């Protein structure tokens, strides 16, 4: 059985290698052909598993994740798996709605008597998984242990504006700020900082005890994490008895696990081609909804060519996102015109758009002082990771920019090397994604404020504009929602003109699941909240709800 399996894998690798070579030379029709061949290869591979199906455990939902969480202490873990699994084990003071706004969590309500004082009133009767009651003392300890260095974590910087935390009574906790900070509530919500028991130290990372709908059972590095339902949960109880997260680093193997029935769910863990193939499986279903993860291009504004605003605008006009969305993303994405997703309360859709217009791009390049000489105006180098879809995207961008006289050289690196170069300013153009961080408008300070050049922030392109700095500073300290929204609207218009980024698209959240799983929901953040409502049905009949 092993020899045919390896033969298919070998054939698939050859198809991918040929497709990359052809795409770098050719056109979108070759790009489409390569994707079609890949779909057929994947389909052949998945068909091979027909005789290898597994019988699922009727009491355990098995979910595929790409890697192990780095640390399940909510004060420390920063990677996506840590934060998303933590959100099932722990409760935060606040939660987030589908409009990416805050809502009650452990705190049933809160008061802001002045810009420097936040008073949170906790639900009574909440218990940790070991039976201890959750009180204001636990909330104070969680943040004090972080701010006072008892636990060493990069998350401490998020709460640097907190001066002190007082316990007014068992169910009232008061945050005192050093200066007004409008984003505090966001930084106390969903997965940002789960509350740990009083006195907790570094043992939380190994044996987490929270108050959430699931309790920790076990974890083995690079293998799995197991959670069980918290039958004493204070809120709406989960339906699943047990959830097992299995670590499957290889994309093709993830598809095989779903096809065999040895896994029930994977979210945002498969290529678009694999999703389309699995959608034809009678035992599987696919659901997708708009997400917030942003793909973007960034420029080094210290570069003599790219510091010219007309050049950056010309690049935006030269790029045609349509074939990339259709053939690379297979329709599982939508165009982006802002760092913020449309679901955000601060999103401004009324900004200058850069629809594909090669003639306008050529005009701007002429105005910028770059005439064509033998068909080439100048060379640019784009750095990217070795991830497959990123390489294919770069090849198509190379072709599109060539049509306006820009020669784009592509350099791919393993992610650690690539990211090191990006953070040290060793690039002209690079492509990356924002995952989660762009859901709150305070991201603008981290990415575009002139005080946030690396290592102090993520302004990796060294963008500096006094107008942008002033708008960011004012919005961060303004507590009135309507005024903040107006400030962020103006900021997004200013950035759309200056164009330190080209925002490409927002990825959909795509969930592939066994039809024995029902009552699923999706939210824009792409977290694992759907496990809080999911049920296992022995009849394998699915009842799917897509919450948009």
Give the residues covered by each predicted segment.
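Append "and occasionally in soluble cytosolic enzymes with long acidic Gly/Pro-rich linkers
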Residues: 229, 306-399, 464, 471, ...
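Gly/Pro-rich hinge or "lid" segments in bacterial periplasmic/extracellular proteins
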Residues: 101, 180-181, 186-238, 242, ...
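Long beta-strand-rich cores associated with HINT superfamily self-processing modules
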Residues: 511-540
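N-terminal lobe/hinge region of extracytoplasmic solute-binding protein
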Residues: 65-114, 144, 207-211
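Ligand-site clamp/hinge motif
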Residues: 202, 231-276, 398-399, 407-409
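Surface-exposed binding/hinge segments that line
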Residues: 111, 121, 155-197
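Extracytoplasmic/peripheral linker and loop segments enriched in polar/acidic and small residues
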Residues: 119, 407-418, 446-515, 539
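Ligand/substrate-recognition segments at binding pockets and active sites
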Residues: 52-55, 221, 368-436, 481
């Amino acid at each position: 059985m092993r020899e045919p399996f390896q033969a298919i894998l070998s054939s698939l690798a050859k198809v991918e290698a040929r497709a990359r070579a052809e795409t770098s030379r050719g056109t979108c029709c070759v790009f489409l052909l390569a994707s079609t061949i890949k779909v057929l290869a994947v389909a052949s591979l998945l068909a091979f598993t027909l005789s290898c199906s597994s019988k699922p455990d009727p009491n355990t939902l098995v979910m595929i994740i790409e890697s192990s969480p780095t640390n399940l202490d909510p004060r420390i873990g920063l990677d996506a798996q840590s934060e998303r699994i933590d959100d099932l084990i722990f409760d935060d003071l606040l939660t987030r709605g589908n409009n990416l706004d805050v809502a009650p969590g452990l705190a049933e309500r809160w008061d802001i008597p002045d810009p420097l004082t936040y008073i949170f009133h906790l639900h009574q009767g909440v218990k940790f998984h070991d039976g201890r009651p959750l009180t204001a003392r636990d909330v104070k300890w969680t943040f004090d242990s972080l701010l006072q260095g008892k636990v060493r974590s990069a998350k401490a910087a998020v709460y640097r504006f907190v001066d002190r935390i007082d316990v007014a009574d068992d169910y009232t906790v008061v945050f005192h700020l050093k200066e007004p900070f409008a984003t505090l509530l966001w930084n106390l919500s969903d997965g940002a900082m789960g509350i740990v028991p009083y006195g907790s130290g570094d043992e939380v990372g190994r044996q987490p005890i929270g108050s959430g709908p699931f309790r920790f059972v076990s974890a083995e590095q690079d293998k799995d994490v197991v959670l069980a339902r918290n039958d004493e949960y204070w809120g709406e109880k989960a339906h699943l008895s047990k959830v097992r997260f299995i670590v499957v680093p290889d994309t093709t193997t993830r598809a095989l696990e779903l096809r065999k029935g040895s896994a029930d769910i994977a979210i945002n863990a498969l290529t678009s081609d694999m999703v389309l193939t699995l959608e034809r499986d009678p035992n599987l279903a696919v659901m997708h909804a708009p997400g917030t993860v942003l793909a973007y291009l960034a420029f080094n504004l210290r570069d003599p060519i790219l510091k010219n605003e007309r050049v950056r605008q010309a690049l935006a006009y030269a790029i045609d996102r349509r074939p990339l969305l259709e053939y690379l993303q297979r329709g599982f994405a939508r165009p982006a015109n802002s760092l913020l997703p449309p679901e955000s309360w601060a999103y401004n859709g009324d900004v200058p758009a850069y629809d594909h217009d090669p003639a306008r791009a050529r005009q701007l390049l002429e105005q910028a002082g770059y005439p064509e000489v033998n068909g080439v105006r100048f060379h640019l180098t784009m750095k990217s990771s070795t991830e497959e879809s990123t390489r294919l995207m770069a090849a198509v961008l190379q072709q599109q920019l060539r049509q306006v006289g820009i020669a784009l050289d592509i350099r791919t690196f393993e992610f650690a090397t690539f990211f090191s170069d990006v953070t040290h300013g060793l690039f002209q153009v690079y492509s990356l994604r924002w995952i989660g961080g762009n859901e709150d408008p305070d991201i603008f300070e981290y990415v575009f404020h002139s005080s946030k050049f690396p290592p102090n922030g993520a302004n990796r392109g060294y963008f500096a504009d006094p107008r942008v700095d002033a708008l960011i500073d004012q919005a961060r300290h303004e507590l009135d929602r309507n005024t903040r929204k107006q400030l962020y609207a103006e900021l997004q218009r200013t950035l759309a003109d200056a164009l330190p980024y080209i925002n490409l698209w927002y990825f959909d959240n795509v969930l592939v699941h066994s039809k024995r799983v029902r009552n699923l929901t999706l939210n824009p953040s792409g977290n694992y909240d759907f496990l809080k409502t999911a049920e296992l049905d022995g009849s394998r009949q699915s009842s799917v709800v897509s919450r948009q």
